[in-house]
């Protein structure tokens, strides 16, 4: 019994923990565990820095292993002992049935039991499929052999998965470090912005203090002068009151003509309630610009004949003289409009347009199917989502145009499209503040839309983080 147990233990130690077969060309790794050379090489195939042991997960630093020739010879001995044991087992396999004392010679498929011929008699196994143990053993041996390769593959895949997962902590550290650096950079820029804004606000406050001090000093001087005038008047009144009737009455006209100075007004201190123009959306907008900025160019084939598109397709302006251009089907012929590239079918995208001092413009997105011969885009906002400057006022066109109140004149407009969310948002880049957001369900391709207006000032697509 002890010999059998020892032999079983030897058989287990002689097998690879990866393929579960006898060790082939055995090698030993840093932690002392043994594997087939090909198995450990496959397990470490995609690793570069840390090489975990498939058994104990010890991190081997350089992925080195050494051949174990002595273990290889022991494996051959273990195989020989296994073969001898198998032959002996075959000789001893003639076992008697405990119930009938007959040789166990048949196998019941339904009950998965080895039986003697008497066991197959009714009623215990009546109607069951029984077959000789030789044929049954061949059948199940083939079945078990068919399990070996799938199990080996499953085990190899599992080892590869474990190896991949073992690299995840390093990936996590790298991701956290990258995000930490991004956050540090964002907060550094934010702090720089706040420092500049603080200096500007404090400088304006100091100027206001100086201005109020000067006005207050002038007001005090005015009251001091007026006080001196009143003292002079008092002296004259006392002096006149002591004169005779004739002298008093003869001095009255002179007195009233010379003493007509009015009292100065009281100066009240007034400080503007100034504050930092830092908007709540600043940090989020900076992330949007950094992550989703997309390069936009103009499509000359859609440009109205009175529009001149620059060679780099980044600038467009209106001219009173019509250009001789091919009559492409998508060219606008009524309003001075041009569309841009690329087409948007999905995703999130940000771009920025410099409008400068133009007196009239409209920008946004539209469907690729927007009619080019119409005088204006659909008023119901079904084909074009845009904001505009017209008649010195900002508006969101639609069935019921909505006025937009901007605290600071917009010289550059940021546009953020979230196709899946069905949102297009507009930002005043002068103060990085949100203007408005349209919500709809987008279907089909969308394109950048530019209404240039009838003045010669250009519209320009910004190529950097902000417009120069």
UniProtKB/Swiss-Prot annotation:
Residues 276-468 form the B30.2/SPRY domain. One of its GO terms (cellular component) is cytoplasm. Keywords: Coiled coil, Cytoplasm, Cytoskeleton, Metal-binding, Zinc, Zinc-finger. One of its GO terms (biological process) is regulation of gene expression. It is found in: Cytoplasm, Cytoskeleton, Spindle. InterPro entries: B30.2/SPRY (IPR001870), B30.2/SPRY_sf (IPR043136), Butyrophylin_SPRY (IPR003879), ConA-like_dom_sf (IPR013320), PRY (IPR006574), SPRY/PRY_TRIM75 (IPR035785), SPRY_dom (IPR003877), TRIM/RBCC (IPR050143). The keyword Metal-binding applies. GO terms for molecular function: ubiquitin protein ligase activity; zinc ion binding. Belongs to the TRIM/RBCC family. May play a role in female meiosis. This is Tripartite motif-containing protein 75. It comes from Homo sapiens.
């Amino acid at each position: 019994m002890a010999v059998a147990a020892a032999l079983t233990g030897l058989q287990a130690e002689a097998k690879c923990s990866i393929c579960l077969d006898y060790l082939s060309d055995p090698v030993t790794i840093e932690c002392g565990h043994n594997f087939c050379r090909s198995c450990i090489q496959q397990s470490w195939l995609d690793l570069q820095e840390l090489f975990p042991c498939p058994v104990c997960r010890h991190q081997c630093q350089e992925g080195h292993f050494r051949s174990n020739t002595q273990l290889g010879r022991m494996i051959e001995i273990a195989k020989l002992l296994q073969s001898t044991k198998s032959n002996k087992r075959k000789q001893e396999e003639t076992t008697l049935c405990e119930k009938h004392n007959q040789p166990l010679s048949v196998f019941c498929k339904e009950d998965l039991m080895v039986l003697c011929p008497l066991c197959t008699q009714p009623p215990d196994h009546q109607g069951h499929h029984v077959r000789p143990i030789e044929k049954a053993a061949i059948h199940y041996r083939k079945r078990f052999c068919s399990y070996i390769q799938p199990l080996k593959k499953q085990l190899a895949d599992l080892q590869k998965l474990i190896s991949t997962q073992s690299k995840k902590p390093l990936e996590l550290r790298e991701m956290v470090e990258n995000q930490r650096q991004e956050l540090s950079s964002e907060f550094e820029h934010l702090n720089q912005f706040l420092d500049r804004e603080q200096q500007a606000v404090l400088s304006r406050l100091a100027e206001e203090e100086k201005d109020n001090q000067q006005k207050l000093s002038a007001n005090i001087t005015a009251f001091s002068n007026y006080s001196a005038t009143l003292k002079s008047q008092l002296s004259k009144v006392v002096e006149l009151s002591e004169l005779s009737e004739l002298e008093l009455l003869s001095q009255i006209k002179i007195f009233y003509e010379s003493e007509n100075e009015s009292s100065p007004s009281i100066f009240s201190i007034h400080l503007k309630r100034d504050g930092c123009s830092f908007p709540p959306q600043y940090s989020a907008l900076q992330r949007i610009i950094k992550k989703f900025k997309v390069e936009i160019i103009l499509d000359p084939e859609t440009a109205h004949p009175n529009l001149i598109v620059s060679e780099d397709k980044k600038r467009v302006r209106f001219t009173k003289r019509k250009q001789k251009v091919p009559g492409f089907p998508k060219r606008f012929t009524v309003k001075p409009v041009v569309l841009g590239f690329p087409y948007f079918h999905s995703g999130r995208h940000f771009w920025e347009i410099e409008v400068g001092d133009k007196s009239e413009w409209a920008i946004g997105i539209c469907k690729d199917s927007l009619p080019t011969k119409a005088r204006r885009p659909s008023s119901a906002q079904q084909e074009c989502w845009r904001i505009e400057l017209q008649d010195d006022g900002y508006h969101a066109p639609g069935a019921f145009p909505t006025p937009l109140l901007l605290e600071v004149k917009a010289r550059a407009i940021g546009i953020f499209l979230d196709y899946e969310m069905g949102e297009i948002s507009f930002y005043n880049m002068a103060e990085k503040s949100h203007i408005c957001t349209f919500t709809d369900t987008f279907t089909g391709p969308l394109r950048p839309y530019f209404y240039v207006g009838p003045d010669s000032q250009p519209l320009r697509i910004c190529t950097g983080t902000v417009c120069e």
